[in-house]
Regions:
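Short loop/turn motifs that connect adjacent beta-strands in outer-membrane beta-barrel proteins
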Residues: 1, 40-52, 80-89, 150-156, ...
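Residues on the lipid-exposed face of transmembrane beta-strands in outer-membrane beta-barrel proteins
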Residues: 1, 33-39, 77-83, 146-150, ...
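Membrane-embedded beta-strand positions of outer-membrane beta-barrel proteins
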Residues: 2, 54-56, 88-92, 157-161, ...
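Outer membrane beta-barrel
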Residues: 1-73, 81-99
Length: 338
């Protein structure tokens, strides 16, 4: 399968959600070729199936601030277990930006051997930068995705966590253990109820494997969605590829577009239902405290520059969508407040 196609990775598929932690619908689709494995039965435990699904993609990112556009490597693998009234899933999503060229570091290696190194998160060859040789070739990020679904009475419940990682050190779970998108979704089996769906999510990305000052410099300051080499960030065509709560911008510390805000505490709720037989509503409310990122804060303090996120910036956003089906089938009338 190839070309531009809507592509999202993550099991939090409610339209009320903030979005996934790695690949969502905030940016337009990235051109790619993909191979995927549809959900198939792997084995059975007490007559209940364990299923597996996954995929592999090769993509082409935009040139942006680079002198040559970098490449995208992507793979994902999910396991699920089902019983009559509940199921569980565990998945791993891995993304890597590699190749391309920058003004500062020049052309990056793209041989078949280099692809092998990117695939297995191995250090780079002598043709790569010193940091790539000691850590891993390319900019690596991803998430662990786990959750449980329960059917009880007239409702379906989904409890989930998407835990992000950045580079090799972040992939070790306990180093940034509090960070992630924590969620609860409740869906009524009555599709015309006054409230058919309710969702609450907590986005927390404050830890990032800790402060670099109290580490041995082999981890810390994960700086989600940013990278020293691919400094444009986890972005495609000017939009964040992952969760839209992460803010793209620039400042006098790093005077190029990058993720200026990735240390976030946000509480998000969504409600969906029917006001009447033919009028559906959706409502979202998000409250967040935003603390910028470790790197910009540290450099601002060392230069004696006021840092705009020092005390945390507060944001409260609302959105209400109304859809009528009687006179104009699936005609949307939307009201947005923020």
């Amino acid at each position: 399968l190839g070309g531009r196609k809507k592509h999202k990775l993550g099991e939090n598929n409610s339209p009320l959600s903030l979005g996934t932690m790695v690949v969502g619908s905030n940016a337009i689709p990235i051109p790619r070729v993909s191979l995927s494995l549809s959900e198939v039965h792997l084995l059975k435990i007490h007559s209940n199936p364990i299923k597996i699904k996954g995929g592999l993609s090769h993509g082409w990112l935009d040139k942006g601030i680079y002198t040559k556009a970098p490449l995208l490597h992507e793979k994902w693998l999910y396991f699920s277990y089902e019983q009559e009234n509940y199921s569980g899933h565990l998945g791993l999503v891995h993304e890597a930006v590699w190749g391309g060229a920058t003004e500062t570091f020049g052309s990056q290696p793209t041989s078949s051997e280099d692809f092998f190194r990117v695939f297995f998160l191995l250090g780079g060859s002598g043709a790569s930068t010193s940091k790539e040789q000691t850590n891993a070739l390319g900019n690596h990020l991803g998430m662990w995705d786990l959750g449980v679904r329960i059917k009880k009475a007239n409702y379906n419940y989904h409890v989930y966590l998407q835990h992000p990682f950045e580079d090799q050190s972040g992939a070790r779970w306990l180093l940034n253990y509090p960070d992630g998108l924590w969620g609860l979704s409740i869906q009524s089996q009555n599709k015309k109820a006054k409230m058919t769906d309710f969702l609450v999510e907590l986005l927390y990305t404050m830890h990032q494997s800790g402060s670099e000052e109290v580490s041995d410099s082999t981890y810390g300051w994960d700086d989600y969605y940013n990278n020293y080499l691919y400094r444009g960030g986890w972005v495609y065509e000017g939009n964040v590829i992952g969760n839209p709560m992460f803010t793209l911008g620039q400042n006098e510390i790093r005077n190029w577009p990058h993720i200026v805000n990735n240390r976030i505490m946000a509480l998000h709720t969504g409600v969906k239902g029917f006001i009447s037989k033919n009028v559906e509503y959706k409502m979202w409310v998000t409250y967040s405290k935003n603390y910028g990122n470790y790197h910009d804060k540290d450099r601002s303090n060392r230069r004696g520059i006021d840092y705009q996120f020092d005390s945390g910036l507060t944001q409260l956003s609302y959105r209400v969508d109304l859809t009528t089906y009687k006179w104009f089938p699936q005609k949307n009338i939307a009201t947005t407040l923020s």
